[in-house]
Amino acid sequence: MAYDKQALIDQLSTLTIMELADLIDGLKEQWGVTAAVAVAGPGAGAAAPAAEEKTEFDVILVDAGASKINVIKELRAITGLGLKEAKDLSEKGGAIKEGVSKEDAEKFKAQLEGAGAKVEIR
């Protein structure tokens, strides 16, 4: 089907804004498309893409502090470890919970810091 591009442009130029909006809506419906903006890929020499927002965090015990008994109690409550395992973890440090949400990581950090421990979230 041949068409005259300039004739089509001239005909569309006579439409009002409301008529154009109706035309666009009709074409979207006919073609099954949305008005989403296409994101261009990075050009040559462009900076590296921004890092994705982190969704999983690790809670790391750095130091149990002076009140180890309270820290051990919190470790047992958070992890479900036995007394010996919680005591060993409090002495050597390391990962308490891995792959948890930011909210949970902040909650665990607050609990352990309240007991006197030094905790990091990575």
From Swiss-Prot:
CDD domains: Ribosomal_L7_L12. Keywords: Ribonucleoprotein, Ribosomal protein. One of its GO terms (cellular component) is cytosolic large ribosomal subunit. It comes from the Bacteria. Pfam families: Ribosomal_L12 (PF00542), Ribosomal_L12_N (PF16320). SUPFAM superfamilies: ClpS-like, Ribosomal protein L7/12, oligomerisation (N-terminal) domain. InterPro entries: Ribosomal_bL12, Ribosomal_bL12_C, Ribosomal_bL12_C/ClpS-like, Ribosomal_bL12_oligo, Ribosomal_bL12_oligo_N_sf. The keyword Transmembrane helix does not apply. GO terms for molecular function: mRNA binding; structural constituent of ribosome. Homodimer. Part of the ribosomal stalk of the 50S ribosomal subunit. Forms a multimeric L10(L12)X complex, where L10 forms an elongated spine to which 2 to 4 L12 dimers bind in a sequential fashion. Binds GTP-bound translation factors. PANTHER family: 39S RIBOSOMAL PROTEIN L12, LARGE RIBOSOMAL SUBUNIT PROTEIN BL12M. Forms part of the ribosomal stalk which helps the ribosome interact with GTP-bound translation factors. Is thus essential for accurate translation. Belongs to the bacterial ribosomal protein bL12 family. This is Large ribosomal subunit protein bL12. The gene is rplL.
